[in-house]
From Swiss-Prot:
This is Troponin T, cardiac muscle. The N-terminus is blocked. Residues 1-83, 111-206 are annotated as: Disordered. It comes from Bos taurus (Bovine). Belongs to the troponin T family. The modification Phosphoserine is found at residues 2, 195.
Amino acid sequence: MSDVEEAVEEYEEQEEAAEEEHEEAVEEEAGGEAEAGEPCTAEDGEEEEGREAEDGPVEEFKPKPRPFMPNLVPPKIPDGERVDFDDIHRKRMEKDLNELQTLIEAHFENRKKEEEELVSLKDRIEKRRAERAEQQRIRAEREKERQTRLAEERARREEEESRRKAEDEARKKKALSNMMHFGGYIQKAQTERKSGKRQTEREKKKKILAERRKVLAIDHLNEDQLREKAKELWQMIYDLEAEKFDLQEKFKQQKYEINVLRNRINDNQKVSKTRGKAKVTGRWK
């Protein structure tokens, strides 16, 4: 049952109850007026007096108590207009249908927005995944290049170390061969005696740098040979800088380890001192 039918039934029940109460009120008023409005003639008065004398005193008339009920006033319908309940029901159904259609359209719009957001989210995830894979690939390539470069530098350093050792061995052999000749030994002793003092570290450094420094003979080189020479010098500088960086890192690590060991030694000394004091105090006690 729809809301319109329920409203119509309630309205009809209220109208019937109001009509019944109105009829009861009209009947009661009509009965009271008939009793109070009858003319009293002389004969009637004499007859009533005779009856009163015969029958005794007549009880006074008491009005019937009326139940307390508010008067329900039915709604007034203007003349010439009729209420079409079918039209009201039809309008109500059209309104409900419009609301339902609005809700359905809103639901589908929200669902469409959610699907679009889901698609965009998936696209962002795929894009981010591709970017991450590309970054990992680039990082792996860079790591591979770094490992290759480190391996090449390590091999180069080992080669230089072996070459340096070979040169040192050759120099030692040459010195031993020179020392075997007595004259050469005397000459060396005389030169040392003439110098009168030992070489300082700075002089030794200058001497070593002078030995390592080579003269660049580039006057007879053409353009391609100059480019190759420049590349060779650049590679040498690069290798020296790499070796310098490795030595600096090694120095930092050794310095850190020295500080850690020093702190451990200090802590151990403090602990040993406190233990010794505790033993002494316990002994004296």
